Amino acid sequence: MQLVVMVAVLALAGAGQGCSFGCHPTNISIQVESCGLTEVIYTTICEGQCYHEDLVYISHYERPEQRICNGDWSYEVKHIKGCPVGVTYPVARNCECTTCNTENTDCGRFPEDIPSCLSF
């Protein structure tokens, strides 16, 4: 259940957001479901962009360090009235640009164009 809620949080983080530079916590609302009941909860996620520079020459032996916006996460439980089963959801405690950790994050390259914040 935690994985499903985390995926929903991360998907909603990018939906309808404008450009944001720097890494910082932001408040969002998400829908959670338990016992067939749905309720909106408010949580905090990490959002923003971290500086990264692609090298002209890409070596197969030494990859450039990729930094991502991440932080310390904890989990809280929400009980929906009339349902004995609680819903666990993530809450970001702080956010910073850190080295991508392949043990808990997909650090691969994004295969498509990344939209720019610049308007020409």
From Swiss-Prot:
Q: Could you confirm whether the keyword Secreted appears in this record?
A: yes
Report the Pfam families cross-referenced here. Answer: Cys_knot
Q: What is a GO molecular function of this protein?
A: hormone activity
Q: Which GO terms describe its cellular component?
A: cytoplasm; extracellular space
Q: Which residues are glycosylated?
A: N27
Record key words, sorted: Disulfide bond, Glycoprotein, Hormone, Secreted, Signal
Output the InterPro entries linked to this UniProt entry.
Cystine-knot_cytokine, Glyco_hormone_CN, Gonadotropin_bsu, Gonadotropin_bsu_CS
Q: Where's it found, cell-wise?
A: Secreted
Example GO BP: ovulation
Which cysteines bridge via disulfide bonds? Answer: C23-C69, C35-C83, C46-C95, C50-C97, C100-C107
- What span is annotated as the signal peptide, if there is one? 1-18
| Family from the record | Belongs to the glycoprotein hormones subunit beta family.
Protein purpose: Involved in gametogenesis and steroidogenesis.
Assembly and oligomerization: Heterodimer of an alpha and a beta chain.
Q: What protein name is recorded for this chain?
A: Gonadotropin subunit beta-1
